[in-house]
From Swiss-Prot:
Keywords: Adaptive immunity, Cell membrane, Disulfide bond, Glycoprotein, Immunity, Immunoglobulin domain, Lipoprotein, Membrane, Palmitate, Phosphoprotein, Repeat, Signal, Transmembrane, Transmembrane helix. Expressed in macrophages and a subset of T lymphocytes. This is T-cell surface glycoprotein CD4. Residues 153-178 are annotated as: Disordered.
Length: 463
């Protein structure tokens, strides 16, 4: 009896020793919350046989009866199915839809043998100042709003997490990635790569930062010219209300230049400062045209855009160049906010600069004759240029004498013409008078002749 008990004990020990060798290999499958996943179940027999899927509590999830599947009473009963077209090949996958992190666990597939599959479901959530998202692949936030991406993983798992931002730049953040002040360049596709048990799953989130595009916010124009203010945006399909308020250089308060709306990608002007005659196009990008720039417009403004998610601000600067020439002076100045790195210069065309200063006003006394150029430059880049034609100084200095000579000549000519006219009139009057005297003498002569003839005839008749 003791020998029989000892034999049974030995047999039990042998079974325990051999148990790890027959334990089925557990396959690991990674899934993403909200997606569908397929748990494999493969048999060596290439035909349709009976199978059953069970959870870790041995509750039936899904099985088959011939060519039909049957659904058990598990909590997954409304989210599971299988692929019948694979049954005849000895494959009986379990498809779980609309995955949740709570679906993570061990699943058993019973066929001619038992197979184990471990499902690990991960979820990526995003939170920012004006909202939150779970499982969404598209996020919109204003520039400057803090964004936090958090990975939710099943209990007991220890995945390796790697973050990659736009431009394939790697970020190290562990289970959380925080962008405290997202800029325009942070917009794009962010990828979270999760690795566990030599399996990998990725989350891709498209982040759109609602902001002004990175372009210069300083505009340069010559007095009298037209200038166009352009403000390209990183978005087109957001409705908004905006306005541009302007504070001229030296002014104590700002003035509303224009207000507008953007609805369904169409811009409409609400109000505008009439003297400016500002023009705005109906289509994006956002553009304002000032037909004629005056020096008093030089200054700074604030463009405000009110969106449903918040407010965007953009500073705007206008620099105006004014060039003048007088009899003895040539001046050039710029008005408005300028950087101290800019250089204002005056020089004759195709010659070295006569005056070049890091100031807002330059001038030349008694400038040489020719074409002068006023240049506002940022190192080798010319931002503004204006040309002035100056007459030769010799001509300018002799101008009074030339004017006196010219006026004297004109006056002498007028006197000569007057004298000639006077002489001509006098001669004409003398000639007229002579003609009249000659006519009178002729008439008198004819009268005397007539009288003598009459007297002779009378004497003859008396005789």
């Amino acid at each position: 009896m003791n020998q029989e008990a000892a034999f049974r004990h030995l047999l039990l020990m042998l079974q325990l020793v051999m148990l790890p060798a027959v334990t089925p290999v557990r396959e690991v499958v990674l899934g993403k919350a909200g997606d569908a996943v397929e748990l494999p179940c493969q048999t060596s027999q290439k035909k349709n046989i009976h199978f059953n899927w069970r959870d870790s509590s041995m509750v039936q999830i899904l099985g088959n009866q011939g060519s039909f599947w049957t659904v058990g009473s598990s909590r997954l009963k409304h989210r599971v199915e299988s692929k019948k077209n694979l049954w005849d090949q000895g494959s009986f996958p379990l498809v779980i839809k609309d995955l949740e992190v709570a679906d993570s666990g061990i699943y058993f597939c019973d066929t001619d043998k038992r197979q184990e599959v471990e499902l690990l479901v991960f979820n990526l959530t995003a939170k920012w100042d004006s909202g939150s998202s779970s499982g969404s692949s598209n996020i919109r936030l204003l520039q400057g709003q803090q964004l936090t991406l958090t990975l939710e993983n099943p209990s007991g798992s220890s995945p390796s997490v790697q973050w990659k931002g736009p431009g394939n730049k790697s970020k190290h953040g562990g289970q959380n990635l925080s962008l405290s002040w997202p800029e325009l360049q942070d917009g794009g596709t962010w990828t979270c790569i999760i690795s566990q048990s030599q399996k990998t799953v990725e989350f891709n989130i498209n982040v759109l930062v609602l902001a002004f595009q990175k372009v210069s916010n300083t505009f340069y124009a010559r007095e009298g010219d037209q200038v166009e203010f352009s403000f390209p945006l990183s978005f087109e399909d957001e409705n908004l209300v905006g306005e541009l308020r302007w504070q001229a250089q030296g002014a104590s308060s700002s003035l509303l230049w224009i207000s507008f709306t953007l609805e369904n990608r169409k811009l409409s002007m609400k109000e505008a400062h009439a003297p400016l005659k500002l023009q705005m196009k109906e289509s994006l990008p956002l553009r304002f045209t000032l037909p004629q720039v005056l020096s008093r417009y030089a200054g700074s403004g604030i463009l405000t855009l009110n969106l449903a998610k918040g407010t965007l601000y953009q500073e705007v600067n206008l620099v105006v160049m004014r060039a003048n020439s007088s009899q003895n002076n040539l001046t050039c100045e710029v008005l408005g906010p300028t950087s101290p790195e800019l250089t204002l210069s005056l020089n004759l065309k195709e010659q070295a600069a006569k005056v070049s200063k890091q100031q807002k006003l330059v001038w030349v006394v008694d400038p040489e004759g020719g074409t002068w150029q006023c240049l506002l430059s940022d190192k080798d880049k010319v931002l503004l240029a204006s040309s002035l034609n100056v007459s030769s100084p010799v001509v300018i200095k002799s101008w009074p004498k030339f004017l006196a000579i010219t006026l004297g000549g004109i006056l002498g000519l007028l006197l000569l013409i007057g004298l000639c006219v006077f002489c001509c009139v006098k001669c004409w009057r003398r000639r007229r008078q002579a003609e009249r005297m000659s006519q009178i003498k002729r008439l008198l002569s004819e009268k005397k002749t007539c009288q003598c003839s009459h007297r002779i005839q009378k004497t003859c008749s008396l005789i």
